[in-house]
């Protein structure tokens, strides 16, 4: 994919995936990091922008890997614990990235790529609305190979 679409840009490669779209409203300060929580390994990319109050996080993409992420329900429950929220969030609706089933809400989309591998995308609504969040998610694809 050479073109990120109108008003967007490419997000690069992250732990075996290509981020094919980053909304124009997302800041240019980009940081990658890796961590582990409750036997799940995260490789993350964060986009920020400077404001008068300091740095503001606009977009986060996390690639999660762990045996406990066997199903979409496992991923949903894991993320609920990680983000300290209700696993039965009524704002989440079903959606798909290719053949992979996921859930999407106003500012977060996540899906199970394969057993043990999930993606979690969180967008600041001031930088990317729910439609752009869905576009970001749809543009995160495994690298060929």
Q: Can you say where each PLM-predicted feature lies in the sequence?
A:
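Surface-exposed amphipathic alpha-helical segments
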Residues: 120-145
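Soluble, non-membrane globular domain cores that form compact, hydrophobic packing
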Residues: 1-5, 142-145
């Amino acid at each position: 994919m050479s073109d990120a679409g109108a008003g967007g840009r490419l997000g690069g490669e992250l732990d075996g995936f290509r981020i094919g779209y980053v909304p124009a409203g997302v800041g240019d300060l980009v940081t990658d990091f890796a961590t582990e929580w409750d036997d799940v390994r995260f490789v993350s990319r964060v986009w920020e922008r400077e404001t008068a109050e300091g740095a503001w996080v606009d977009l986060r993409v996390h690639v999660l890997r762990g045996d406990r992420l066997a199903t979409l329900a496992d991923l949903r429950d894991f993320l609920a614990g990680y983000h300290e929220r209700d696993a039965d969030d009524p704002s989440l609706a079903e959606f798909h990235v290719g053949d992979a089933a996921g859930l999407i809400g106003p500012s977060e989309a996540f899906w199970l790529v394969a057993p043990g591998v999930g993606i979690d995308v969180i967008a600041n609504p001031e930088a990317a609305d729910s439609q752009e969040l869905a576009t970001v998610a749809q543009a995160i694809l495994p690298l060929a190979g």
